[in-house]
């Protein structure tokens, strides 16, 4: 059976039109109704908007941050795996899922402030993060901000800028095409979807982020940069990010795309767990220094 997906280029959600997905099979079905779990779901008033979040498990806090147009359910594969090991905290980012938008111009800076606000709301002393796509961008922004004590973070398919030096050219073109379609819907006063919200999400993809590479040196956390070797984000850009973070490791997943957390969650989760659970190492391959 063909799956309907929404391609906001850096994430997968239901969308403007059906896209046949024959090559990448993703799982978003779980026994627990993640994102709709009334038993654990709560709202917090953060920076003027009601932000919906859920918590699972006990232990050290682990934030899971989803990608553009996604929701809590998007990272159900990670919740399933990590909730037996950590206190998993996951929210619908502003304007997505059950969380309010309350702005006419959404930015990664705003989403970052929201997550920092949620950390303060929950009175968390320190955290670790797994961020996918836009969630990875937010994780990097939180690390640069330095307002939250972050032990470790794993980013999957994150980028510093929206142009073709970082993102594959076909994806840049697709964002432009989708923008035109959304603007047409707004002009037609179509009411089948909230097209103004859709435009804001596409503006995030097309115009942001704009993180100076030099700012990565401010990140004190230990970071694992992950990407698929067939990612939307260019591998050389993932390498660029890795090379400018003081305490970083790099993992290019063979035979995987931007969607590995859902298409190959077993491998992705094992990689992330190994990084989070084991002492950080960045050995020098110069054996003349070995003792």
Feature roles, as predicted:
Residues 90-130:
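Active-site loop/oxyanion-hole signature of alpha/beta-hydrolase fold enzymes
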Residues 2-7, 13-60, 85, 277-291:
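Alpha/beta-hydrolase fold catalytic core
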